[in-house]
Curated annotation (Swiss-Prot):
Record-given protein name: Large ribosomal subunit protein uL2
Example of a GO MF term: rRNA binding
Cellular component terms per the entry's GO annotation: large ribosomal subunit
Source superkingdom: Bacteria
Record's subunit section: Part of the 50S ribosomal subunit. Forms a bridge to the 30S subunit in the 70S ribosome.
Keyword rRNA-binding: yes
UniProt xrefs under InterPro entries: NA-bd_OB-fold, Rib_uL2_dom2, Ribosomal_uL2, Ribosomal_uL2_bac/org-type, Ribosomal_uL2_C, Ribosomal_uL2_CS, Ribosomal_uL2_dom3, Ribosomal_uL2_RNA-bd_dom
Biological role stated in the UniProt entry: One of the primary rRNA binding proteins. Required for association of the 30S and 50S subunits to form the 70S ribosome, for tRNA binding and peptide bond formation. It has been suggested to have peptidyltransferase activity; this is somewhat controversial. Makes several contacts with the 16S rRNA in the 70S ribosome.
Family: Belongs to the universal ribosomal protein uL2 family.
Keywords: Ribonucleoprotein, Ribosomal protein, RNA-binding, rRNA-binding
Length: 277
């Protein structure tokens, strides 16, 4: 992946830094694994805003990605690597030996023409998906399941990965990028290696309009609102918030913990908030 800085021919181009990837497929996505994606602009079925700052943007088609990787012991060839507008990672289109095609998250260093395989008997090689019980301790992994057969939920974005730290009984300990160490069942599957497009965070959008193309609307500061709209609102002229930063609903917005899932708290061996020593 190469980063390209645009010449400052206009204010909008001055700060643009985008990736240039010659290996990406230039054509349309595979139609059998593509479906329409309807925008809801952050509204629920009643038309009320449930997620702020969402609306507009370019139309996207959704690519159906195989997160389960349960087609075992059949080698698959990487036909092409594609851009996906719905996520930061790239997609790899696999063609299995029986002719079936599936999209997967493209791992780092995976190339067109290489082969990957799923299953417990697969070699420990970048792009292969195995149950955690068959992965050596210390391996770097991504696309990790939280429940066996449910599909990958952890370490799916560009450049992300985790590390298998230990195995004890029916559970393994996996260290995530946040520093959290979490117990995951050894029958859950994970993919070897880290996710590709690792320089995604080094890109610069460059102008406000490009953010709107992505379907993101402006964020208004609370102190610029009226008291009816935000706890920080109101006052004559330019004023400070007058209290610690909070959300429009009064929840502390800087550093307050919001996790409420007590059911799985015993699966966390080390919190992401603990001091890193």
């Amino acid at each position: 992946m190469t980063l390209k800085k645009s010449k400052p021919t206009s204010p909008g181009q001055r700060a643009v830094v985008r990736s240039v990837n010659s290996f990406l497929y230039k054509g349309n996505s595979y139609s059998a694994l593509t479906e329409k994606k309807k925008k809801n602009s952050g509204r629920n079925n009643s038309g009320k805003i449930t997620v702020r700052h969402i609306g507009g943007g370019h139309k996207h088609h959704y690519r159906i990605v195989d997160f389960c990787r349960n087609k075992d012991d059949i080698p698959a060839k990487v036909e092409r690597i594609e851009y996906d507008p719905n996520r930061s990672a790239y997609l790899a289109l696999l063609c299995y030996a029986d002719g079936e095609r599936k999209y997967i998250i493209a791992a780092k260093d995976i190339e067109v023409g290489s082969y990957v395989v799923n299953g417990s008997g697969s070699p420990v090689k970048t792009g292969n998906a195995l149950p955690i019980r068959n992965i050596p301790v210390g391996s770097v992994i991504h696309c990790i399941e939280l429940k066996p057969g449910k599909g990958a939920q952890l370490a799916r974005s560009a450049g992300s990965s985790a590390q298998l730290m230990a195995r004890e009984g029916d559970y393994s300990q996996i260290r995530l990028r946040s520093g959290e160490i979490r117990k995951i069942h050894i029958n859950c599957r994970a993919t070897i290696g880290e996710v590709g497009n690792s320089e995604h965070n080094l890109q610069s959008i460059g102008k406000a309009g490009a953010v709107r193309w992505r379907g993101i609307r402006p964020t208004v500061r609370g102190v610029a609102m009226n008291p009816v709209d935000h706890p920080h609102g109101g006052g004559e002229g330019k004023t400070a918030a007058g209290r610690h930063p909070v959300s429009p609903w009064g929840t502390p917005s800087k550093g307050s913990r919001t996790r409420r899932n007590k059911r799985t708290v015993n699966m966390i061996v080390r919190s992401r908030y603990s001091k890193k020593g």
